[in-house]
């Protein structure tokens, strides 16, 4: 497994420091940390007397070999394979916007870009939905109807709305919600 990947880790917010320390221990110095919230249905939360979970979302760029090492460490040290301890996954990176950006993201690890290859069979896929603020529950209702287990929401601001507004002739909301869901491949609708 070679290549460059965007690694995402989603955990409870109070576990962020633990993951960041773990990644630093494994030599990853360039990470992006942001916060989101879980999307468990309110009736499930009410039944267990829980509140909506605040989530930490950590992004980093890793090589295929680094991912193998990290995955083993995550399972052995963090016990990430136990439900409720977080989730980590990778997405292939097909391009990076310039030499300086590439060097920054690979942090001098000596990665040499090889030939591009097609995506191999995977059991899971990352579904990313960008919706106007306030529509997350509508998105999650549809996802749950298709048996998606849940997701993580990050509040964001849309950019480039001026061009889209000119094209559509209506004003567009700038406040967005980015919803990440990891789903089994067989549960994904065909495109």
Regions found by a protein language model. Name each.
Residues 1-191:
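Positively charged, small/polar-rich N-terminal and surface patches that mediate targeting and assembly
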């Amino acid at each position: 497994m070679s290549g460059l990947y965007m690694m995402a880790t989603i955990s409870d917010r109070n576990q962020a420091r633990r993951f960041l320390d773990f990644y630093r221990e494994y030599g990853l110095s360039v990470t992006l940390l942001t916060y989101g919230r879980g999307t468990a249905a309110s009736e499930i939360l009410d039944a267990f007397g829980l509140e909506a979970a605040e989530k930490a979302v950590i992004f980093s760029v890793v090589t295929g070999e680094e991912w193998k090492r990290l995955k083993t460490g995550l399972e052995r040290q963090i016990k990430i394979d136990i439900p409720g301890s977080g989730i980590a996954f990778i997405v292939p990176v097909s391009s990076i916007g310039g030499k300086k950006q590439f060097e920054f993201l690979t942090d001098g690890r000596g990665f040499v870009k090889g030939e591009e290859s097609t995506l191999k069979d995977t059991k899971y896929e990352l579904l990313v939905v960008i919706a106007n603020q306030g529509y997350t529950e509508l998105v999650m209702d549809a996802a749950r109807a298709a048996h998606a287990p849940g997701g993580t929401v990050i509040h964001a601001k849309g950019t480039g709305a001026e061009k889209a507004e000119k094209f559509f002739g209506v004003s567009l909301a700038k406040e967005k919600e980015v919803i990440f869901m990891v789903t089994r491949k067989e549960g994904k609708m065909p495109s």
